Amino acid sequence: MAKALVLEKKGQLSLRDIPVRRDLSPTDVLIGIRTVGVCGSDVHYYTHGKIGPFVVNEPMILGHEAAGVVLEVGSQVRHLKKGDRVCMEPGIPDLSSRSSKLGIYNVDPSVRFWATPPVHGCLTPEVVHPAAFTYRLPDHVSFAEGAMVEPFAIGVQAALRAGIRPGDVGAVMGAGPIGMMTALAALAGGCSKVYVADLAQPKLDVIGAYEGIETINVRQQAVSEALAGATGGWGADVVFECSGAAPAILALPSLARPGGTVVLVGMPVEPVPFDIVGMQAKELRIETVFRYANVYDRAIELIASGKVDLKPLISATIPFDESIAAFDRAVEARPTDVKIQIEMPA
């Protein structure tokens, strides 16, 4: 038994003891959790009780963005040792599956992902996890930054899928946490400038403080107009759709240059219209993103090198004993909040 933040059912959280796995296989590690980020999917399970086909039918521990310390290693683990500071990739695929063998383990149908029913998450003091999906953090990278690797990895995956070339002009629709991570990954990946569009000025103020980022408030100016003015009527080389909003998705052909690339990162709640002819008329290349695969090392190196600074995106750090309040704050969706983190007792 261990104390954990448990989603009992839709709209009901509790901090209580719950049975958790403690047995170590030869390829596992036991990790003492130190910092956990609150993700939009965690909040959605809290408020709606489900995401698509994944329904909370029994109590589930929340949390999947985490960093911590190795407490024990399995007998076959060689790249980690007790005391190592680590972050964890929360999806555990079947390594013998066809998807995994193709290197796209993120779309393995049998993947078990933290805090996705019926799999428990990591908002509990200790977790057992495969060493293969546990990554050492450099000494100067904090636990808070380590817990940001998971959402940043989505941005890195998007940047890689985009096939950015040095000097490209990027555009990001949506200034939520993933939109911001994607914009920073696109800059690190070679974009000379990235335009970020959103309705919420406080969010734009946060991401706009970064060098190389320009913001567009869509309440004040159409994104297509702003990008046309900035690119001599040409359009962005790469457009990342991170909002999941139907109007933004429908407008995509008007934002990209002829022969450009559109990367679909945001996930609409319901099916949305898509301008296929508009895409065809410009021969736009369309890429999609689902989580990430084989990018954690890259994400950690970008943070460790100082190339990407995610610390300004951490809006609040709240103690584990107040984690229900942390989730209630996340539900509020305060205009200036980007990432709320929960700090576990050492």
From Swiss-Prot:
Belongs to the zinc-containing alcohol dehydrogenase family. InterPro entries: ADH-like_C, ADH-like_N, ADH_Zn_CS, GroES-like_sf, NAD(P)-bd_dom_sf, PKS_ER, SDH-like. This is Putative D-xylulose reductase. Binds 1 zinc ion per subunit. GO terms for molecular function: D-xylulose reductase activity; zinc ion binding. PROSITE patterns: ADH_ZINC. It holds the Pfam family ADH_zinc_N. Keywords: Metal-binding, NAD, Oxidoreductase, Zinc. Its EC number is 1.1.1.9. Zn(2+) binds at C39, H64, E150. The keyword Zinc applies. Its cofactor is Zn(2+).
